[in-house]
Amino acid sequence: MSDFLTIAIPKGRILEESVALFGKIGIHCDELLSNTRKLIFENREQRMRYMIVRATDVPTYVEYGCADLGIVGKDTLMEQEKDLYEPLDLKFGYCRMMVAEPAGLARDDDPSSWSNIRIATKYPNVTEKYFAKKGVQVEIIKLYGSIELAPLVGLSERIVDLVSTGETLRQNGLVEVETIAEITTRLIVNRASLKTKHPRITEIIEGLEKHV
């Protein structure tokens, strides 16, 4: 099986867009979209293997060589800082990582005057580094979901989270005050695999480049 290429892909919209994109370069993996609990799929004819994993686990599987390639959001890569090769921006899954706060607070707030603030987020590493560069002391509360709830119940004054349309923020009375980064989906590669399977991986990268 060492001649197989293994790709780690998360479920959801990224999976659907990834299957469509790979189809454009002749790598057909439509079976990944079937209603099944299978987590590993193989295409022996094309010598490809696919692993369905949690988005936050994709970099780990690639870093340790369980997968040669992975598809994952830039937000996850920024937070985890794994030792990976990141050759390609796939240009889908666009959103923004931003700082938000209640609209009432924002009316009289000046981000340049922040000195000691409390923030709830799924991204403690990114948040800490961002505010350290600004010279702002920050207490970070790590949450795993429904980040918008934190300011509403007094857990934090502000949040750092991903926003696509901003509708969830608006419905919860929050507004964006600063953008930390623009996020898209990336192709990542295990560094050892890039050497041992260089021709096949390079062919995939160059093929995908023509369609993004």
UniProtKB/Swiss-Prot annotation:
Keyword Zinc-finger listed: no
Keywords per UniProt: Amino-acid biosynthesis, ATP-binding, Cytoplasm, Glycosyltransferase, Histidine biosynthesis, Nucleotide-binding, Transferase
EC number: 2.4.2.17
InterPro entries: ATP_PRibTrfase_cat, ATP_PRibTrfase_CS, ATP_PRibTrfase_HisG, ATP_PRibTrfase_HisG_short
One of the record's GO cellular component terms: cytoplasm
Subcellular compartments: Cytoplasm
Main subcellular location: cytoplasm
Pathway the protein acts in: Amino-acid biosynthesis; L-histidine biosynthesis; L-histidine from 5-phospho-alpha-D-ribose 1-diphosphate: step 1/9
One MF annotation (Gene Ontology) recorded for this entry: ATP phosphoribosyltransferase activity
Chemical reaction(s) catalysed: 1-(5-phospho-beta-D-ribosyl)-ATP + diphosphate = 5-phospho-alpha-D-ribose 1-diphosphate + ATP
Family: Belongs to the ATP phosphoribosyltransferase family. Short subfamily.
Function: Catalyzes the condensation of ATP and 5-phosphoribose 1-diphosphate to form N'-(5'-phosphoribosyl)-ATP (PR-ATP). Has a crucial role in the pathway because the rate of histidine biosynthesis seems to be controlled primarily by regulation of HisG enzymatic activity.
Entry's free-text remark on domains: Lacks the C-terminal regulatory region which is replaced by HisZ.
Quaternary structure (record): Heteromultimer composed of HisG and HisZ subunits.
Name of this protein: ATP phosphoribosyltransferase
Gene (name only): hisG
